Amino acid sequence: MCLELDNNLSDYFKACTYAYYSDYENFIKYYDNEELFDEDDLNFHLCIGIRNSYNFAVKMENSGLKLTSGILSSISARYIMSNKVCDFNFKYLPSGIWYPNVPTKETCIYLLEKDPKYSLVIKTICVLLGWDDVCDKCDKICTEVCFRLSIIFNRRSFCEEDTIYNYKIHENKNILEKVEKDKYLLPETILRNKDTTLEIFFKYNYTSKQSNIEQIIDDMLYTYIDYSQNTEFGPMDCVSVDKSVYYNMVSYKPYLDININTVEFNFLNSAYVLKHHKEYPDDLCKKAVLNLLVNDIYDSNFVSLYRPFYFYTYKTLNKYMVQKLLIDFPRQRYAILVNYAIMNITEDLENYSPDIDLIRIAYASGSIEFYNIMMNKAKKEGGMCQHLDFENEKYIFKYHKYEDVDFDNLHKNNGHPLLLRATHLNFP
């Protein structure tokens, strides 16, 4: 990667930045070996860089550095999510293999046949995506978070007979602690507190209290769809890295081909395309703007020039970004509200018509309050609208009478929309 950063930045900041962007050569140039064990931020950004790049994971495995267990677990996860299973995966069992993308069913079945312990992590994918055929091949074990998700997503049969464990990685060892079902794991209690579970699982916080602080990301069976909200880590959070690079990039030469996928899923390529936007087609610039928005960068000039159709990608927009976009671009409000449907945010829903796609996405995301509000409005008004043509990326308007809606198809849950947007091909 040919990314040049301002000389006044510290070597430590540069090491974290290059790790975050999966740039092995520059990471090696600026890091201090001792910091792999002492610095939380560096571990955190290494784990992100590894999960986002198969090539970076391979280089880190073969670097000769003494790596923390969280980093080793992230390398194992990246191999699996790229469907490149090897002996390494059976030495280091990852704690999460669904972020930033999921492996194929064939990869999951192969892992289960080779090592039944993979039931712990694959069962969670089954719950998220409704893979009942793969779930049948898993052992009757799951994690507490997976059990809670099975209740929230109305897939109780996936886990109802399972023995529940808390699972973590400590000093390169897999530690299982059996969890007894108590009143806090009763379905009614889980549903009453489902927002907390979804908040933990999908959006927030690598900074939970840990017995071994060096394991920043991968020591428990938690992984988060929106890792931009790492606010408790101070100045080295993801948002500050992205913003610093975007506004202070001295020069950059893309190391990946510039195309729809490498722009939508690679922040540096997005920044590069917009800095040379007159040389690229509008569709590519729209993907670049989207990548900036989900990384909390609102460049009003480019948002106005290249307004995307989709307003979510491998992560959702943060709540405040959604509110700003709703004010600035009211005609795109239903596309923007997809983020609320995914995150179960119900503010001001009374101001919007019930929308068939938002209802479907809310159902698939387990966003029950959002779903119920929209459905109740549809019943009261006698129908629901359709504002989005996802296939052709166009805004439309169609009205469906309530009695004409095919609710069996509407409630067909094909998995969480964020997970289904990404494939391993986007993570070189």
Curated annotation (Swiss-Prot):
Keywords, ordered alphabetically: Glycoprotein, Plasmid
Keyword tRNA-binding in annotation: no
Source domain of life: Eukaryota
Glycosylated residues in this chain: N8, N205, N344
Function: Not known.
More details: The presence of the two linear plasmids, termed pGKl-1 and pGKl-2, in strains of Kluyveromyces lactis confers the killer phenotype, i.e. production of toxin and resistance to it, to the host cell.
This protein's name: RF4 protein
Species in which this protein is naturally found: Kluyveromyces lactis (strain ATCC 8585 / CBS 2359 / DSM 70799 / NBRC 1267 / NRRL Y-1140 / WM37)
